[in-house]
Amino acid sequence: MTLSINNEFVWEGIQVKVSLPSTYDPNQIYPAILLNDGNLDFLSSLSESVILVGLTSKNRLDDYTPWKVAALRDGAPAFGGQANAYHDHLFGGLLDQLQSLYRLDEARLGYGGYSLGGLAAVYSLFSFDKVSCVFSICGSFWYPDFVTYCKEENVKNLDCLLYLQNGQTEGVNHSNRLAQAPV
């Protein structure tokens, strides 16, 4: 199924794509899903009942990572550790903008992604409580010190549902720190 994109705009460096249900009624409220990396086609089966919001950051290696870390290999860019600033933009201003444009059900907001996008979503649980569901598909939990951080820090969003999905062979074919991906 091909999604129809009803609105596209840039909010503080984040490319935003919005797909409304085809029967969108401005007098009704709708659950919404915010998806890092913006590939809404993964969620197309939900498109008739949910507002889908694709988010594409300017630099995913910076915006989806919690702290600075060296590159995985020589010649590759380092990880910038700007997830807090990204989430400040997302939950501080962009979410308000979306709520002014569309009828979002504040009690049914989901946020997630895959790989680094999933890492960022899980990391948001420790500082923000704006969403009721967080999901991570093959989240980059190999990220240095992330598992330790999760064990030692307090979660702020205690009422949030959390869905994690990882493959059983995460990191198997890597010779760098990706090989340390938790299963």
Question: Predicted segment positions?
Answer:
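The feature captures the conserved acid-bearing segment of alpha/beta-hydrolase catalytic domains
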Residues: F141-V183
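Short glycine-enriched nucleophile-adjacent loop
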Residues: G118-F128
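Active-site loop->helix "elbow" adjoining a glycine-rich segment at hydrolase catalytic centers
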Residues: Y86, S115-G118
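Serine-hydrolase catalytic machinery in alpha/beta-hydrolase-like enzymes
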Residues: W11-I14, Q28-R103
